[in-house]
Amino acid sequence: MFDRQYPTVHDLYIPFPVFQSRLEQPFDTTVTSIRELRTISSQSTVYGYDLTVNDPLYYDLEPLLGNSISLTLDPKLTDSERLDAVYLDINNRLANCHGDLLRKFSATSYSIDTSVIPYVFLPMYRYLLHIMTGSAFNSLFRQMIVNVDANCANADESLLTSAQHLFALLNKINPSRQLPAPLRHILINATIADVPYDMQGKFVPYNVVFLPTSNESLRDATIARIREPAGYHPRPSIVVPHYFVFRSTTDALCRFMYLAKRTFLHVNDKTATHTSVRRCELLRLNFPLDQSFAQLSLLVQLQLPLSTLSIQRLPHLSTTVNQLITLASSSYSEQAIINLLRVNWNVIGYIELSTLGEPSLPAIRVYDFTSSMNTRSVTQGPNVQIRTRSNAIDVHVREFIRFGRYLPLEIPKCRVPRLVSLQVINYSLNHLLSVTPWPDQYDVTRHRPERIIENSVKRTIQYQEYDPSVGTWATSSDMTNYTHIPSDSYYHQFIVTCLRSFCGLRDLPRENSARYPYVVLLYGLALGHEIAPSRMGLTYAMTSHMISYVLSTITTGIDVAPSEIISRFKLFLIDVPFADTIIHDLRKVTPNVNVHSTSIFTSNERGDARILTGWVVIRIAVSRFEQQKRSFEYMSYFNDILRFCDGGIIHFDIPDATFLMHVVTSLQCTPNRRVKVLSYFASQSPFSLTLHFYRDTTDPLLPVANIGHWVTRHQMKRYAYTDRDSTIPLRHEVIPALSTVMSRMTAEYSFVCQKSDLPVCLSALSTISNYARVATWTDYRGIAHWSGSAVIDPLRLLDSSRTGVLATNVPIEPLIAPSHGVPRLERSTYRVVDAFHLCSLIGPIFIQREFNIWTASRTSERTRHVIDVGGRDGAFRGLFPHAMYTVIDPAPAPQHMISNYISEPWDFNDFQGSLDRIMDTLGIIDPQDVFLVFSHVFISALNRPAAHVNALEQLGALQCSSVVSTQTSGSSASTLYSSYVNHNPFLEIRMENAAYLTRTYPSPYPLPTRAEMNEAILNNARSRLHQTSAAEILDLAMRFGYAPSYEAIVTLPALCDQHVVYAIQ
């Protein structure tokens, strides 16, 4: 076995005389490896051999030797004897081929300029082997030759500065740089059908075609015109543009799936550097992929770190779809074509707007596969702003890799584990690859499962096409298909091992092997991971239909009583989304299971506590006075229960600070017990709080110590791509940790570049800001330059790092450098602040973002006026440096604000009249020159929830733009979801015991519910809503040099849920 050495740039070019002598020499055995191929089930069984060669001249032996070689090799032979037999056969084959090549080279040598040193480009030679006959040989042979000036003292320098169009990019590359070059594999004494299906793509034949130009942008158009299946790596390993041509679609898909496995291993190799290996091996193909292939392509590119629990309340897509259809039928009535895809009869799964003419709006894609995901949109073309009722779509100027027509932008983050054992890694990858329908050509009997409905995933898809010119849905077709998973013992064993480790299930007998569909791998393990006492406990982010499916699946065909399985889960549910559905499913599976809910403040606490050996949910619904008065008694009950349970949920309606500290201290003092703060549910009090505690035990059944990194939680995440980078960089790969660098990052970046570098600079700036100023100018030599600058937008920076689109070379220095004279946001030490101070950080950032959007959309050069209602001390003055800033407040004006202050108050019963009066006072002619800001003034000025709603309705009727930063009361679970989604059966939450979830709780001041506030503005197409999470606020706090206090960590999730910013543009 040789040590793999990657070639350098110079290794790909050898002088023509040396090249000829190499063809006359025998096959070099020192760069060759022959590896035994063994079956997974029986490692002692050898079914063939794998031949690889680490020599640039022989990287591609398939044109010479074919896809496989049949030799008579005695298994008892030693390695050296086996190699001798193979080399003898290969030399005989190469001798004939090389003789033909030498004769052709002699016949075409007249075309070589003898005044220069001819060099041979080896990648072109590999392609030349595919066309041994035909007139194309002569022309390609001439392209293979690089002429180097013989008078040049340094031939290498002349080579790098050659004017040949194929090598125009070489002047940007270090000649000693290593280039990852793929090894071509040839089977010996085996066929592709003998190879495991996840490795067949390693041996499929393909041709490498080099473009006769250095323009990579022509590659898409080139492969689109050819009839054969073709594809290319978006990040090539060599600088010359090239693509791969396959014999059939089956070969291309086999190669695609093999590269998916390699990508999975590269991405999760923690020791590999970015330059040592190409992390993303996937191909961009010239034919549409099945949806499952596209999903697989994204799935394998995600790393597997254990993520923290996050709760996302997201808007439904129905209003978005209506808005897009309206937009298409009005703004693009003559050009737009809308394609609609419904998956499993969800409200909307996919919508695409495309134009038939000039690409003013080439494509907008929206995906929703679970009805509970964050929805984004990606455009291919110029910047387009589309305002929807609930801001469900953010349009980004991005061009992402098209792995298929229906590429899901978001997929579950519960993925297969990364284990120390290579055997289990092979298991996990086999299951990942099995989600796709395998090509028929290489299906063999032992891989083809029986057609059993219970083991298949039924997917019903409805395609519709809407033509706005006629106003009707032009076509409609339905398709139902079943995805079958190969039923082999290793797939089953892997599932059983994970479920046993997470949930304590016993081994399943081989004869009763259940054939699980792939959702058990993606969801079943996530569910088991969540409810395992040794890990993070109950799941909060799963949809009920998924939980129902998993519960029914894991109890099918298992030689364990259902009641015993359920009892192992120890589900004690209350105050959990979809709790009624879970309870219903548990009782449907086993009617005798006792799903117990308890409160520590009932008459039978101690009796209940004796049986609480698993998980318990506790609700503390007494007043603060009672908590203080009976603190010792309550803590006694509380400690009794904690001694018996492995973990649970504690919900405080209105926690008393002293009692809360006692509870948290008691939880933390227990050995091996951890406490986390969750976003609160089912409460109208702004101070309600939910704690999650669990015992961090070690299960002896766990196969590896880091099993917690196996399966991440069920979350949905969007990943956008650029055309030049197909990998998905994670946050820590993109920029250093926010906690260490953000507080010292410069406030603005600028660039000066030529036109060729402009796309890179704009791409970099777009990851840190939503707006930039760019200008072009010509120097004294007549060379055009481009310059620009962008101020960092913290929210955009967070979006970029979260969605994975931030380039790894941002900021690009010295091409993009910090602007001189711009103050740095530096702070030597962190300042500890409370939750209210942290929550107030986000409001100004939202307001500034909306102001920048408003400024960018204005075409008038008139003065911009910002009117801050209730601003008082002018704290927001710094957000609008290029606008006339005026404060409306009845309080006395500060000394520095006297010249920009109006003491006559705003009339909240007559918004239009107040606006007209202020415009007359300031001499403003057009209301579109006005930007209104209401920063928390609604809370103090409006004393009834109905008044809030009325104020928003009036605000929406004004002709100016406005931003309202306010608070809403926490809604009950069903009310909260109703403000975002339609009342679909699987999203409604009906708790069984209403005593634990009353709809009203005491509130310190009257606030409207989120649903009431949304109802006031959802009918206004100009409005959008901003809301953030505690994690994002903590990131921003680190950037500005703030650290949360202990009380802030406890109460921040609840306060974040209250804080909301409405914008009307």
From Swiss-Prot:
Its main location: virion. Keywords: ATP-binding, Capsid protein, GTP-binding, Methyltransferase, mRNA capping, mRNA processing, Multifunctional enzyme, Nucleotide-binding, Nucleotidyltransferase, S-adenosyl-L-methionine, Transferase, Virion. Its EC number is 2.7.7.50, 2.1.1.56. GO terms for cellular component: viral capsid. It holds the Pfam family VP3-like. It catalyses: a 5'-end diphospho-ribonucleoside in mRNA + GTP + H(+) = a 5'-end (5'-triphosphoguanosine)-ribonucleoside in mRNA + diphosphate; a 5'-end (5'-triphosphoguanosine)-ribonucleoside in mRNA + S-adenosyl-L-methionine = a 5'-end (N(7)-methyl 5'-triphosphoguanosine)-ribonucleoside in mRNA + S-adenosyl-L-homocysteine. One of its GO terms (molecular function) is ATP binding. This is Outer capsid protein VP3. It comes from Cryphonectria parasitica mycoreovirus 1 (strain 9B21) (CpMYRV-1).
